[in-house]
A protein has these predicted regions:
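Catalytic-site signature of metal-activated, phosphate-bearing donor transferases
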Residues: 1-196
């Protein structure tokens, strides 16, 4: 199941639900579209995402000697190769719901999380490129928090301009998660005590 990543609301007049972005599965098309959608930072991004694009796997647990990893599974030490893509299923990833949330998680992600130095950069034809750790470190060194905010505004905020560019490439999704209703349905005894 491949992810879609939530965009941060830019005003309080939003309809129910959140805007999400997706990306092209084919690598060359993804590179081209990402550069078009995110004009300043696209060349350094994998599909415009701050997190993974690998998706998640669902594996039958009764398979003998199965081992799970975050983005794949192994049976008897061999990575699973047979897969069925659930194209109609959307894995909604809420990576950075607003700039303050982005900053709160930033240092941890830079050191030990999804922006750490040992992760590969977005694939490019020449193999050169900055990974998110190098990009964020460069931005922060040259422009401080204002540069990080500029990045966040282009890549993460559901501005009308970004939504239009995503829609032009069929990568804009509107989803009403309605988490309060889901909690009430599946956990009626605790739904009213959970912070909304």
């Amino acid at each position: 199941v491949y992810p879609i990543e939530a965009l941060a609301p830019v005003d309080d007049s939003a309809h129910p639900g959140l805007w999400f972005k997706s990306y092209a599965r084919q690598q060359a098309l993804r590179r081209r579209q990402t550069a078009e959608i995110y004009p300043e930072f696209g060349p350094h991004l994998n599909g415009g995402f701050l997190s993974h694009v690998a998706g998640k796997v669902f594996i039958r647990t009764r398979i003998p000697k199965v081992n799970f990893r975050i983005h794949n599974g192994f049976v008897q030490g061999e990575q699973l190769s047979a897969e069925t893509s659930l194209a109609e299923t959307k894995l909604c990833h809420l990576h950075a719901r607003d700039f303050d949330h982005f900053l709160q998680a930033y240092r941890y992600r830079l050191a030990r999380g999804s922006y750490r130095a040992d992760l590969k950069p977005a694939p490019t034809p020449d193999g050169a490129g900055l990974n998110l750790n190098a990009l964020f470190s460069l931005l922060e060194t040259e422009g401080g928090e204002a540069a990080l905010r500029r990045f966040y505004a282009e890549v993460c905020e559901a501005s009308p301009a970004l939504r239009a560019r995503l829609a032009d490439h069929d990568h804009l999704h509107r989803i009403d998660l309605d988490l309060a209703a889901k909690r009430a349905r599946f956990f009626p005894q605790t739904a009213s005590t959970v912070a909304k």
